[in-house]
């Protein structure tokens, strides 16, 4: 499963870069980096005419958790060794009519293994129809696998992005999830589902 997830993240990264370049004519800058223990990743950054700043990054690393982390990470108390692979996408557009988009997904293994991640939008201007469409797409995909997923993971995202000092949310939310042993991202045909939901948001 680890290699399957790694390959899926790499293919998704290539597709996201390709589809972003359809509307953004500036090219991405790529930079590889190495992890101090083992592994590394590929940073793909852009500053363009439509995307003010953006990054589509992948990584695959392994190592050992320190004693503090061993107590907080599932399965690490039995064995501190870990491997992780994932993708992180952040797109901040020039136009206030286009929302900022954040998306990340990871697969982590200790003595246990699981998927985690999330996706959210932060618009400058409120477009109710588009906000409803975004959440309906997420709900539709989640409901294919478990009707409890969407309300549970939407609530988690809403709570995380609630600004207590302002008494208001940041953006329109999305979903957060963690500790899924059989993630909806990796069960056919869900990768196609997630791409259909995600790409219009990033454009």
Task: Go through each PLM region and give its residues.
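Single conserved hydrophobic/aromatic residue that forms the stacking wall/gate
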Residues: 186-203
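Gly/Pro-rich turn-and-neighbor structural signature
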Residues: 2-74, 184-188
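A short mid-domain helix/strand-loop element embedded in enzyme catalytic domains
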Residues: 155-180
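Internal mixed beta-strand/loop scaffold within catalytic domains of large alpha/beta enzymes
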Residues: 42-117
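Compact, glycine/acidic-enriched structural inserts
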Residues: 113-149
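Flexible, glycine/charged-enriched surface loops at secondary-structure junctions
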Residues: 27-30, 150-154
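Hydrophobic/aromatic-lined pockets within catalytic cores
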Residues: 17, 21-25, 95, 106, ...
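A generic structural motif
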Residues: 93-95, 111, 121-127, 178-185
């Amino acid at each position: 499963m680890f290699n399957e997830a790694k390959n899926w993240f790499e293919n998704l990264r290539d597709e996201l870069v390709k589809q972003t370049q359809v509307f953004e004519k500036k090219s991405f800058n790529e930079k590889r980096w190495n992890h101090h223990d083992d592994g590394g990743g590929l940073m793909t950054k852009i500053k363009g005419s439509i995307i003010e700043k953006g990054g589509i990054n992948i990584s695959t690393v392994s190592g050992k958790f320190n004693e503090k982390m061993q107590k907080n990470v599932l399965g690490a108390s039995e064995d501190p060794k870990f491997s992780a692979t994932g993708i992180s996408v952040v797109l901040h557009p020039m136009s206030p009519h286009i929302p900022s988009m954040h998306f990340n997904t990871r697969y982590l293994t200790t003595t246990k293994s699981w998927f985690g991640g999330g996706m959210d939008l932060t618009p400058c201007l409120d477009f109710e129809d588009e906000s409803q469409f975004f959440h309906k797409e997420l709900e539709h995909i989640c409901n294919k696998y478990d009707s409890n997923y969407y309300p549970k993971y939407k609530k988690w995202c809403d709570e995380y992005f609630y600004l207590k000092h302002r008494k208001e949310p940041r953006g329109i939310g999305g979903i957060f999830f963690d500790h899924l042993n059989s993630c909806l991202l990796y069960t056919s045909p869900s990768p196609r589902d997630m791409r259909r939901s995600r790409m219009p948001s990033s454009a």
